[in-house]
UniProtKB/Swiss-Prot annotation:
Its cofactor is Zn(2+). This is Large ribosomal subunit protein eL43. The gene is rpl37ae. It comes from Pyrococcus abyssi (strain GE5 / Orsay). Binds to the 23S rRNA. Signal peptide: none annotated.
């Protein structure tokens, strides 16, 4: 995997775009690639399939979420209003 010590996976951009933006991209990608909690079975086994599409490796549940995280701040508010 390409990367650097300072910006990790955003090292693929080389010197372009500036350090601050590359650090921000690296932080978002790190959050996106970690395992998340499944809303169906509760296990930490959710991975991103595509933009906004998430799948639990344990129970096989496929659901829509945010582009980079399965639960967005707006989604949390909407869920609270519905309940």
């Amino acid at each position: 995997m390409s990367g650097t010590k300072k910006v990790g996976s955003a090292g693929r951009f080389g010197p372009r775009y500036g350090l601050k933006i590359r650090r921000r991209v690296a932080a978002v990608e790190a959050k996106m690639r970690q395992k998340h909690v499944c809303p169906v079975c509760g296990r930490r086994a959710v991975r991103r399939i595509s933009t906004g599409i998430w799948q639990c490796k344990k129970c096989g549940a496929i659901f829509a979420g945010g582009a980079y995280l399965p639960v967005t701040p707006a989604g949390k508010v909407a869920k609270r209003v519905v309940e």
